[in-house]
């Protein structure tokens, strides 16, 4: 930090499931909040999945870390290991994806999100601008990331994808970094980050087509605007990697109520173990209290409720809110 002339903020990469990724990150974020209160903190958090599970207690760690970092983090991009795993298998024909395969794909996404800080473009956006556009309420700060095109070199050799094709692909759940179904949720915000050989005219046409074709529902208190960034630097790939070198790509960041499905899945797994107090003694032995578990779980229940509430129409009368 001392070497920086104009520090904008911190990017923190961690997993939810492991002890270090969850525990140490929580401590680190708290320290950063104390020492650099005004600087923004963005997380890239790896959400646990059954395919590449490292610990039985992943649901505990995930809930505990989400609770402690919820107040500290300005924006968190969740990456669901299962979603990445499936993309590698389906789009890249990798039968048994390794961490390297998964990480290269995640790297591509991080690169897209930070491209606007690093290169020039027609419609450039910086880190703070994302937050302003994507985070309507402090707690609702988990955008869904979708990336396209994810194709292997063999496939790309035969086809180059147009702006409208890659834009359309962003609305396919199979290209999302978290398994959830936005068709069942409502959007609060939507940012499209294009890079490479892309002109505004094509983007406008692609988005107009999406608005007419797709049933994209925005919450009624939000204008149905898509924020667009265009960056002229085409995506680069790791030499000899899985991903094809393409002329244009897009990364979509959307804040949708559908991502609450991910919390619901974790909460359910937490509940199954916690009902039996399984494995809790290990945490208590390290100086934690059982109360911290229920406190964290209640906070997550409140988060699910927050998502439910932002999705309900603001026109509904007060009395109707009682039923839930």
UniProtKB/Swiss-Prot annotation:
The keyword Hydrolase applies. Some glutamate residues at the C-terminus are polyglycylated, resulting in polyglycine chains on the gamma-carboxyl group. Glycylation is mainly limited to tubulin incorporated into axonemes (cilia and flagella) whereas glutamylation is prevalent in neuronal cells, centrioles, axonemes, and the mitotic spindle. Both modifications can coexist on the same protein on adjacent residues, and lowering polyglycylation levels increases polyglutamylation, and reciprocally. The precise function of polyglycylation is still unclear. Some glutamate residues at the C-terminus are polyglutamylated, resulting in polyglutamate chains on the gamma-carboxyl group. Polyglutamylation plays a key role in microtubule severing by spastin (SPAST). SPAST preferentially recognizes and acts on microtubules decorated with short polyglutamate tails: severing activity by SPAST increases as the number of glutamates per tubulin rises from one to eight, but decreases beyond this glutamylation threshold. GTP binds at residues 15, 19-20, 54, 81, 103. The record marks 324 as: Involved in polymerization. GO terms for biological process: microtubule cytoskeleton organization; mitotic cell cycle. Keywords: Cytoplasm, Cytoskeleton, GTP-binding, Hydrolase, Microtubule, Nucleotide-binding. CDD domains: alpha_tubulin (cd02186). InterPro entries: Alpha_tubulin, Tub_FtsZ_C, Tubulin, Tubulin/FtsZ-like_C, Tubulin/FtsZ_2-layer-sand-dom, Tubulin/FtsZ_GTPase_sf, Tubulin_C, Tubulin_CS. It comes from the Eukaryota. GO terms for molecular function: GTP binding; hydrolase activity; structural constituent of cytoskeleton. Signal peptide: none annotated. It holds the Pfam family Tubulin_C. Gene3D superfamilies: Helix hairpin bin, Tubulin/FtsZ, C-terminal domain, Tubulin/FtsZ, GTPase domain. Its cofactor is Mg(2+). The keyword Nucleotide-binding applies. It is an enzyme of class 3 (hydrolase). It is found in: Cytoplasm, Cytoskeleton. Its EC number is 3.6.5.-. GO terms for cellular component: cytoplasm; microtubule. It catalyses: GTP + H2O = GDP + phosphate + H(+). The active site is at residue 129. Dimer of alpha and beta chains. A typical microtubule is a hollow water-filled tube with an outer diameter of 25 nm and an inner diameter of 15 nM. Alpha-beta heterodimers associate head-to-tail to form protofilaments running lengthwise along the microtubule wall with the beta-tubulin subunit facing the microtubule plus end conferring a structural polarity. Microtubules usually have 13 protofilaments but different protofilament numbers can be found in some organisms and specialized cells. Tubulin is the major constituent of microtubules, a cylinder consisting of laterally associated linear protofilaments composed of alpha- and beta-tubulin heterodimers. Microtubules grow by the addition of GTP-tubulin dimers to the microtubule end, where a stabilizing cap forms. Below the cap, tubulin dimers are in GDP-bound state, owing to GTPase activity of alpha-tubulin. Belongs to the tubulin family. This is Tubulin alpha-8 chain. It comes from Gallus gallus (Chicken).
């Amino acid at each position: 930090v001392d070497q920086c002339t104009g520090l904008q903020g911190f990017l923190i990469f961690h997993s939810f499931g492991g002890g270090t990724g969850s525990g140490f990150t929580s401590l680190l974020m708290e320290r950063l909040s104390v020492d650099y209160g005004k600087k923004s903190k963005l997380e890239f958090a790896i959400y646990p999945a059954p395919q590449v599970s490292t610990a039985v207690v992943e649901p505990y760690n995930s809930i505990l870390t989400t609770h402690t970092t919820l107040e500290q983090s300005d924006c968190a991009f969740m990456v669901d290991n299962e979603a990445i795993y499936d993309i590698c298998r389906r789009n890249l024909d990798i039968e048994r994806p390794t961490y390297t395969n998964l990480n290269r794909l995640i790297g591509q996404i991080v690169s897209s999100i930070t491209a606007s800080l690093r290169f020039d473009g027609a419609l450039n956006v910086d880190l703070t601008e994302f937050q302003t556009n994507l985070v309507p309420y402090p707690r609702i700060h988990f955008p869904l990331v979708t990336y396209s095109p994810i194709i292997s070199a063999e496939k790309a050799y035969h086809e180059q994808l147009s702006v409208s094709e890659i834009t359309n692909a962003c609305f396919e759940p199979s290209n999302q970094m978290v398994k959830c179904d936005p068709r069942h949720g409502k959007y609060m915000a939507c940012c499209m980050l294009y890079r490479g050989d892309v002109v505004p005219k094509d983007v406008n046409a692609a988005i107009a087509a999406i608005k007419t074709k797709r049933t994209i529902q925005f919450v009624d208190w939000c204008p149905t605007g898509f924020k667009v960034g265009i960056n002229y630097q085409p995506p680069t790939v790791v030499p000899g990697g899985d991903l094809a070198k393409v002329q244009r790509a897009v990364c979509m960041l959307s804040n949708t109520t559908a991502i609450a499905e991910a919390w619901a899945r974790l909460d359910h797994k937490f509940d199954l173990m916690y009902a039996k107090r399984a494995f809790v003694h290990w945490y208590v032995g390290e100086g934690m209290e059982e109360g911290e578990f229920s406190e964290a779980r209640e906070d997550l229940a409140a988060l699910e409720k927050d998502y439910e509430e932002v999705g309900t129409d603001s026109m509904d009368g007060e009395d109707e809110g009682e039923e839930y």
